[in-house]
């Protein structure tokens, strides 16, 4: 494997490695215990380390403690490296590494360093696990992503932070994380290959309404429309939108902050067999507040964004909402 990237300045790298056979050797997912310590009170014994978010965290097993210890020592051993955010899930690890190429020795080999860290972590962890050899600890395959500090880095940090909660959300609400294909519903055009993930009951609302906020207008000019959309959503109506333009993204941001609001997020691509929603999106799927809906075949890719498909999606959203209103009228 060979990586091509600019080796100047600061660079972030996101590694994912899995335990051989996906055995749960590193940690277990636990509820986050509320802190009940009185002011000025000192706990006689520090609690076992928990990295937690949204009510769930990981409690490290001895093997996980060994890997975490090595990760935290990275900077002390190599000052041009910084071990940033990480989470050790039961059967895999997500690690975010910062490399300062201004201070790195000439010819620093990132992949060679990764192999050395992998082997050291395997040796330290397997020492806590009788019967498991270091060579059999990790899967051979791994995943690496070179991050853009301005865009992908914040998303990866959120992903790491929410990973324990995301796992529990999916296990607690398998119906809301199931991928539905060949979907049929009175509001959906039967000629299209609909697929979805989330709360399908949203399709049954008679109060679906399409949202399209053009990129051609600055965000502040959309404020009256955004206020109206939020008011309708607070009163039980369901916005149907791709949430792609700056104005639409602002609507989604505000909807998420409004308890009780629900929405349908349509996408201009297919939902592949292993469609995996983001950690942030998983929060709202688990709460039954969102439906992800596609009218495209599963092999239509998400990237690069297909703008003609976005316009097709908006047109189909409008038809969907008309059918919902017509169905409500016919039942009266």
What are these regions (language model features)?
Residues 1-182, 190:
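Short catalytic/metal-binding and nucleic-acid-binding patches
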Residues 179-332:
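Glycine-biased, small-residue-rich flexible motifs in mid-sequence functional cores and linkers
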């Amino acid at each position: 494997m060979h990586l091509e990237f600019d080796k100047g300045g600061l660079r972030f790298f996101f590694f994912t490695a899995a335990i051989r056979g996906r055995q749960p050797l590193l940690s277990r997912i636990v509820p986050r215990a509320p802190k009940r310590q009185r002011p000025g009170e000192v706990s006689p014994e520090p609690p076992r380390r928990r990295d937690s978010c949204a009510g769930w965290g990981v409690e490290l097993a001895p093997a996980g403690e060994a890997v975490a210890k090595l990760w935290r020592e990275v900077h002390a051993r190599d000052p041009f490296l910084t071990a940033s955010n990480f989470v050790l899930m039961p059967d895999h690890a997500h690690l975010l590494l910062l490399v300062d190429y201004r201070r790195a020795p000439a010819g620093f080999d990132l992949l060679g360093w990764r192999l050395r860290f992998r082997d050291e972590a395997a040796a330290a962890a397997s020492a806590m696990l009788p019967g498991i050899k270091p060579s059999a600890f990790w899967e051979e395959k791994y995943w690496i992503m070179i991050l853009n500090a301005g865009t992908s880095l914040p998303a990866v940090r959120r992903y790491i932070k929410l990973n324990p909660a995301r796992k529990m959300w999916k296990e607690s609400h398998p119906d809301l994380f199931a991928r539905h294909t060949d979907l049929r519903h009175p509001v959906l055009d039967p000629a299209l290959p609909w697929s979805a993930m989330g709360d399908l009951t949203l399709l049954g609302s008679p109060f679906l309404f399409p949202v399209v906020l053009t990129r051609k207008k600055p965000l502040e000019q959309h404020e009256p429309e955004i206020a109206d959309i939020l008011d309708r959503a607070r009163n039980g109506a369901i916005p149907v939108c791709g949430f792609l333009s700056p104005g639409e993204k602002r609507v989604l941001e505000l909807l998420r902050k409004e308890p009780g609001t629900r929405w349908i997020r349509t996408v201009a691509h297919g939902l592949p067999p292993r469609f995996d929603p983001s950690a942030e999106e998983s929060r709202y799927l688990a709460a039954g507040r969102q439906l992800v809906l596609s009218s495209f075949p599963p092999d239509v890719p998400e990237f690069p964004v297909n703008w003609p498909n976005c316009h097709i999606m908006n047109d189909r959203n409008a038809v969907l909402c008309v059918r919902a209103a017509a169905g409500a009228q016919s039942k009266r």
